UniProtKB/Swiss-Prot annotation:
<keyword id="KW-0800">Toxin</keyword>
<feature type="disulfide bond">
    <location>
        <begin position="76"/>
        <end position="81"/>
    </location>
</feature>
<keyword id="KW-1015">Disulfide bond</keyword>
<dbReference type="GO" id="GO:0090729">
    <property type="term" value="F:toxin activity"/>
</dbReference>
<dbReference type="GO" id="GO:0099106">
    <property type="term" value="F:ion channel regulator activity"/>
</dbReference>
<feature type="disulfide bond">
    <location>
        <begin position="64"/>
        <end position="75"/>
    </location>
</feature>
<keyword id="KW-0008">Acetylcholine receptor inhibiting toxin</keyword>
<feature type="disulfide bond">
    <location>
        <begin position="38"/>
        <end position="62"/>
    </location>
</feature>
<keyword id="KW-0629">Postsynaptic neurotoxin</keyword>
<dbReference type="InterPro" id="IPR054131">
    <property type="entry name" value="Toxin_cobra-type"/>
</dbReference>
<protein>
    <recommendedName>
        <fullName>Three-finger toxin MALT0058C</fullName>
    </recommendedName>
</protein>
<comment type="similarity">
    <text>Belongs to the three-finger toxin family. Short-chain subfamily. Type I alpha-neurotoxin sub-subfamily.</text>
</comment>
<dbReference type="InterPro" id="IPR018354">
    <property type="entry name" value="Snake_toxin_con_site"/>
</dbReference>
<feature type="signal peptide">
    <location>
        <begin position="1"/>
        <end position="21"/>
    </location>
</feature>
<keyword id="KW-0872">Ion channel impairing toxin</keyword>
<keyword id="KW-0964">Secreted</keyword>
<comment type="function">
    <text>Binds to muscle nicotinic acetylcholine receptor (nAChR) and inhibits acetylcholine from binding to the receptor, thereby impairing neuromuscular transmission.</text>
</comment>
Amino acid sequence: MKTLLLTLVVVTIVCLDFGHTLICYNDHGFIGKTTETCENGMTTCYEKRWTEARGTRIDRGCGCPNVKPGVNLNCCKTDRCNG
């Protein structure tokens, strides 16, 4: 009986994935592409691109922000999906 109970607890923890936090690339300008662990409850990563006088700019991070017209936005829901 104890073995069955332990098995059920382990299966529950694995299936619910307690404590999983999303990992997104964060590229904010000239720093380069690194990763960040998103806050609990945040379920999306984003990549936004726009063109300015110096060329195409790319910004990445956690969340899915609102953008101005002319900015291309891609949001996704898996680790490192915004690369």
